[in-house]
Structure formats: structure tokens, C-alpha cells
Amino acid sequence: IQSTSMDQGBLSEDSMNSFIRTLIQAGIWKNKVPKQTARTKDGTQTAVKKTKAEPDVVANKDRLGFQPIVSVDAELLRQQRRFSSPRVLLSENTPLEPPPLYLTEEPMGLNRTSRRKRFAEGKSHRGEYSVCDSESRWVTDKSSAVDIRGHQVTVLGEIRMGPS
């Protein structure tokens, strides 16, 4: 992917809009691949020229739900590293599987309403919160629990209100 003068706009633009514009210019957005490649038996890639009948075949495949797999060049990710977003993290590294939250065998892991920061590699110190399921159900036979800070607390059987 080569950058054009349009990519080098002023730095006050939204970083994700700039990234999406770069993808659109490269033909990656909406599954448009600028150049088709084919693999030979020895694993090397060669460029394939389109024939006149090929656009009809591609259009029919798109109507049937076929979507080609598009790989994004690692150089594009390196160029976009300066952009930061609270929701999207562009990284060349694959995420940990499973996330560190599920590896801990603590009472905190059993509390499905708590949120814990995951460990983030590098210098960004970005806090990633795991998304937990919510469960609306009364529990009547519980005498102790773990609060959102991880402290053991006693569950009151009854609450007295008003003058005593």
C-alpha cells in the first residue's frame, strides 16, 4: 500500500477516519482486492490477469455470500501505530488465548459482575476490561460473597429499616 498526498492531511483529523480512508484507497474496504494472486504448487504467488468473464463470476459469488479473505500488510499496521483509540488496538501480535482473566482460579473469577483489568503488553498501559455476562437471579442461601474490589463480605439475611 502506497501513501498518497491525500493520506498526508493535517494531523487534526480523526485517526480512525484516516485509517479507514487508507484502507478504502488501497481497495481493501468492502472486500475489494486490487490484484488477484494465485498459489503455485511450490507455494509461490503469481499475479493473475482478469478475463472478461471473471467479473460476472465474482459478482455471482458476492450475491451468494462469498467473501474473499483479505490480509492487511504489516507495514500498514506499523504506519498506523501512532494512532490510538480507546476501543481498537492495532497490533502485530496475536492475543493471548485464553485471556489472563480466565486463567486465575480465585473467588473473584466466580463473581460474574466484576470487571478486572487485563495485562497489556508494551508501554501503552491501556486498560482493557473484559465483557462479563449479566445474570439477574436472586440467591437466597448465600452468607458470604466477594465485592467488586475483591474483598470478602458478609451477606445480610435481613435488613431492618426505620426506628428500632
Swiss-Prot record:
Signal peptide: 1-3
Protein name: Neurotrophin-3
Region ranges (Disordered): 89-126
Pfam families (alphabetical): NGF, NTF3_N
Subcellular location: Secreted
UniProt-recorded Gene Ontology molecular function terms: growth factor activity; nerve growth factor receptor binding
The family this protein is said to belong to: Belongs to the NGF-beta family.
Glycan-carrying positions: 111
Keyword Signal carried by entry: yes
UniProt keyword annotation of Lipoprotein present: no
Main location, first listed in the record: secreted
Stored SUPFAM superfamilies: Cystine-knot cytokines
GO biological process, one term: cell surface receptor protein tyrosine kinase signaling pathway
Function as written in the Swiss-Prot or TrEMBL entry: Seems to promote the survival of visceral and proprioceptive sensory neurons.
Gene that this sequence comes from: NTF3
Keywords: Cleavage on pair of basic residues, Glycoprotein, Growth factor, Secreted, Signal
Propeptide, residue positions: 4-118
Annotated organism of origin: Cylindrophis ruffus (Red-tailed pipe snake)
GO cellular component: axon; dendrite; extracellular space; synaptic vesicle
